[in-house]
Amino acid sequence: MEYEGYNDSSIYGEEYSDGSDYIVDLEEAGPLEAKVAEVFLVVIYSLVCFLGILGNGLVIVIATFKMKKTVNTVWFVNLAVADFLFNIFLPIHITYAAMDYHWVFGKAMCKISSFLLSHNMYTSVFLLTVISFDRCISVLLPVWSQNHRSVRLAYMTCVVVWVLAFFLSSPSLVFRDTVSTSHGKITCFNNFSLAAPEPFSHSTHPRTDPVGYSRHVAVTVTRFLCGFLIPVFIITACYLTIVFKLQRNRLAKTKKPFKIIITIIITFFLCWCPYHTLYLLELHHTAVPASVFSLGLPLATAVAIANSCMNPILYVFMGHDFKKFKVALFSRLVNALSEDTGPSSYPSHRSFTKMSSLIEKASVNEKETSTL
């Protein structure tokens, strides 16, 4: 998210902001620090974009066309779509950073791109929370879950998630704006005062706007509560309940489920905690050294967006649902290579089918000792 002017009239100066996309403006840092950070952001965001589009795209194809429609595949597809859309719009902001934070895409795209990024953030977080709650219910109430857990209900839940994310992301459509800076650049920022855009500079003396500040606080606190604190509390409570239930009933004979649970919680916490913490501190920016924001926000933002390319690994490929298809996918790739290169030492399709069957049986046996 851009670390840019709070609004167009420099009510709080360019050091005070509440950007709603995933690029950080580094004008507050020194020239060398800013340049290094810009290069760092472009490289990291490009890597995340590539891995995210590839990984989430593969998940969408596999879950949609190669797997039976189940509740889990509904979760996985929606989670992958949210992250995929997030990654699709990253090139716009990568270009923004590469052009030294000169916005050339117009006011409408400033609003739309920021809205979509925020919407996908909320959607991903809510879906992870729903997945955690669904798994918890499956362990605590297996009979009820078996009778009421349906694909139709999963689709309805996803619709609610996307609509709720739309509502929480709507401030981007209202407050995002563009303005020319004193350096001759156009910046995309949050105009919480809703005043007519005017060129601003670092030398402008900050004024007081209680309405704009209250809007800033409302957006930031809402984002922290709904996009982090409440989901983290629910996710942690769900998995702690699962661990307690499995330990008490001795349903798990291996430590793998617990490793997955710990990985999910720690990864989610580490990815988003620094980001939300720094933006909460930004509400009282005068009491915090400028270097904390100029250097900390780029790193925190990069870590946060990295979650979008790690989700396929953490929430899909570590689960049992994709084990069978991973073998089939490998078999298809080998057969394709064999057709292109002619006779080779690769095993035949029949041998791969047999091996796939054996691995599937082993997966079923393992699943009986694990709930994830």
From Swiss-Prot:
<dbReference type="InterPro" id="IPR000826">
    <property type="entry name" value="Formyl_rcpt-rel"/>
</dbReference>
<feature type="topological domain" description="Cytoplasmic">
    <location>
        <begin position="320"/>
        <end position="372"/>
    </location>
</feature>
<feature type="transmembrane region" description="Helical; Name=7">
    <location>
        <begin position="300"/>
        <end position="319"/>
    </location>
</feature>
<feature type="topological domain" description="Cytoplasmic">
    <location>
        <begin position="63"/>
        <end position="73"/>
    </location>
</feature>
<keyword id="KW-1015">Disulfide bond</keyword>
<dbReference type="GO" id="GO:0032088">
    <property type="term" value="P:negative regulation of NF-kappaB transcription factor activity"/>
</dbReference>
<feature type="modified residue" description="Phosphothreonine">
    <location>
        <position position="371"/>
    </location>
</feature>
<dbReference type="InterPro" id="IPR002258">
    <property type="entry name" value="CML1"/>
</dbReference>
<dbReference type="GO" id="GO:0002430">
    <property type="term" value="P:complement receptor mediated signaling pathway"/>
</dbReference>
<dbReference type="GO" id="GO:0004930">
    <property type="term" value="F:G protein-coupled receptor activity"/>
</dbReference>
<feature type="topological domain" description="Extracellular">
    <location>
        <begin position="1"/>
        <end position="39"/>
    </location>
</feature>
<feature type="transmembrane region" description="Helical; Name=4">
    <location>
        <begin position="153"/>
        <end position="174"/>
    </location>
</feature>
<feature type="modified residue" description="Phosphoserine">
    <location>
        <position position="357"/>
    </location>
</feature>
<dbReference type="GO" id="GO:0006935">
    <property type="term" value="P:chemotaxis"/>
</dbReference>
<dbReference type="GO" id="GO:0032695">
    <property type="term" value="P:negative regulation of interleukin-12 production"/>
</dbReference>
<feature type="modified residue" description="Phosphoserine">
    <location>
        <position position="348"/>
    </location>
</feature>
<keyword id="KW-0325">Glycoprotein</keyword>
<dbReference type="GO" id="GO:0005886">
    <property type="term" value="C:plasma membrane"/>
</dbReference>
<dbReference type="GO" id="GO:0045600">
    <property type="term" value="P:positive regulation of fat cell differentiation"/>
</dbReference>
<feature type="transmembrane region" description="Helical; Name=3">
    <location>
        <begin position="113"/>
        <end position="133"/>
    </location>
</feature>
<keyword id="KW-0807">Transducer</keyword>
<feature type="modified residue" description="Phosphothreonine">
    <location>
        <position position="341"/>
    </location>
</feature>
<dbReference type="GO" id="GO:0006954">
    <property type="term" value="P:inflammatory response"/>
</dbReference>
<feature type="modified residue" description="Phosphoserine">
    <location>
        <position position="338"/>
    </location>
</feature>
<dbReference type="GO" id="GO:0007200">
    <property type="term" value="P:phospholipase C-activating G protein-coupled receptor signaling pathway"/>
</dbReference>
<feature type="topological domain" description="Cytoplasmic">
    <location>
        <begin position="134"/>
        <end position="152"/>
    </location>
</feature>
<feature type="topological domain" description="Cytoplasmic">
    <location>
        <begin position="245"/>
        <end position="260"/>
    </location>
</feature>
<dbReference type="GO" id="GO:0010759">
    <property type="term" value="P:positive regulation of macrophage chemotaxis"/>
</dbReference>
<feature type="topological domain" description="Extracellular">
    <location>
        <begin position="96"/>
        <end position="112"/>
    </location>
</feature>
<feature type="transmembrane region" description="Helical; Name=5">
    <location>
        <begin position="224"/>
        <end position="244"/>
    </location>
</feature>
<keyword id="KW-1003">Cell membrane</keyword>
<dbReference type="InterPro" id="IPR017452">
    <property type="entry name" value="GPCR_Rhodpsn_7TM"/>
</dbReference>
<feature type="transmembrane region" description="Helical; Name=2">
    <location>
        <begin position="74"/>
        <end position="95"/>
    </location>
</feature>
<keyword id="KW-0297">G-protein coupled receptor</keyword>
<dbReference type="GO" id="GO:0007186">
    <property type="term" value="P:G protein-coupled receptor signaling pathway"/>
</dbReference>
<feature type="glycosylation site" description="N-linked (GlcNAc...) asparagine">
    <location>
        <position position="191"/>
    </location>
</feature>
<dbReference type="GO" id="GO:0120162">
    <property type="term" value="P:positive regulation of cold-induced thermogenesis"/>
</dbReference>
<feature type="glycosylation site" description="N-linked (GlcNAc...) asparagine">
    <location>
        <position position="7"/>
    </location>
</feature>
<dbReference type="GO" id="GO:0097004">
    <property type="term" value="F:adipokinetic hormone binding"/>
</dbReference>
<keyword id="KW-0597">Phosphoprotein</keyword>
<feature type="modified residue" description="Phosphoserine">
    <location>
        <position position="351"/>
    </location>
</feature>
<feature type="transmembrane region" description="Helical; Name=6">
    <location>
        <begin position="261"/>
        <end position="281"/>
    </location>
</feature>
